[in-house]
Amino acid sequence: MIFIASATMGLESVVKEECLALGFKNIKVFDGRVEFEGDFKDLVKANIYLRCSDRVFIKMAEFKALSYEELFQNVKAIEWQDFIDENGEFPISWVSSVKSKLYSKSDIQRISKKAIVEKLKEKYKREIFLENRALYSIKIQCHKDIFIVMLDSSGEALTKRGYRAVKRLAPIKETLAAALVYLSKWKPDEVLLDAMCGTGTIAIEAAMIARNIAPGANRNFAAEKWSVIDEKLWTDIRDEAFSNEDLSKELKIYASDIDEKSIEVAKENAEKAGVEEDIIFEVKDFKDIESPAKYGAVIVNPPYGERLMNDEDIEELYRDFGKFCKKNLAKWSYYIITSYEDFEKAFGKVATKNRKLYNGGIKCYYYQYFGDRKNGYRN
């Protein structure tokens, strides 16, 4: 089987590295997705272990269609009965069509649904399907007349780890937060600071990475209710994930924010994630932070225009943050994600490198400043 790990634009290479680390085979990278081959064990592992992917799909088919009749026949040719139970719910929950002859999303959805029903009629010898049991959500995307039909095994997006208690303003997705940590090359024996932590997502994801806590071990997935996958697979891989957790390391992760309520929520989130003892939370303006070490890494998702503040406030904030870093964290490495176009000017320093990413649909750049000891922040 071919599986698809979807990815936010800009994070495909990070998801690829995760897939390689999990031992998946024949990995291929495309815009917005990473494909790999495997069996149901790999599908379960992908859902439980991937930190930066949004969802995991089974790739049911890829074909060219220039007419609705071609679309119908190609969708009907898929062996749906091998996956969908007799009373399973099989909505076509998402359709996209770009630069294609067949562009009507509603027509693509209607024709494809009809094709699936006709296929299942042949298998189950019935005219009506109740669709009141396990969920088999179907996604169809078409680009330049090439259709990809996918079956969603995740259900809720993988960013839903299960630890976020209360949403505050403009939270960063857990999948993106984990990617920021990976891209920083931070190591668990190094100091980490998030000086504008909000509800603590970056610090929590860093602690989970350091502890090797699988992000999906404590949540459920749509495919757990599919009869085609042995329940024991889910149990065994979860047990494996729990046994692989590393509680031996002493972590030095610091997270602070000027908003007291955000820190309260951050502590609740950390407790739910099982890392409350690994992070030192403080209610504090970043200007008042004293350096916890000579070397370290700062990873922040500060407020920016489309989300929380106007340009004048943002420029002042970034200018002050640049001064703070230069004065208090002179030998540290800094990693800042923002959509503000003039960030480097306001911060007062040109980044060593930057990377285009998307945060909640907003185009951002991840500015990376390598410190004196970018390959090791040990003190």
Task: Label the model's feature ranges.
Residues K41-I48, E156-T159, N375:
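Short, charged/polar, Gly/Pro-enriched secondary-structure boundary elements
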Residues S97-S100, A157, P303-R307:
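A short, flexible beta-alpha/helix-coil linker loop
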Residues I172-S291, E306-R307, D311-E315:
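Conserved S-adenosyl-L-methionine
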Residues C19, I92, I140, N301, ...:
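Residue-level signal for inorganic ion chemistry
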Residues D285-D288, P292-N379:
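C-terminal catalytic and target-recognition region of SAM-dependent MTase-like enzymes
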Residues I138-S154, Y367:
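C-terminal edge-of-domain segments
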Residues V149-L183:
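SAM-dependent Rossmann-like transferase core, predominantly class I methyltransferases
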Residues M1-A134:
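Non-catalytic nucleic-acid substrate-recognition regions in nucleic-acid-modifying enzymes
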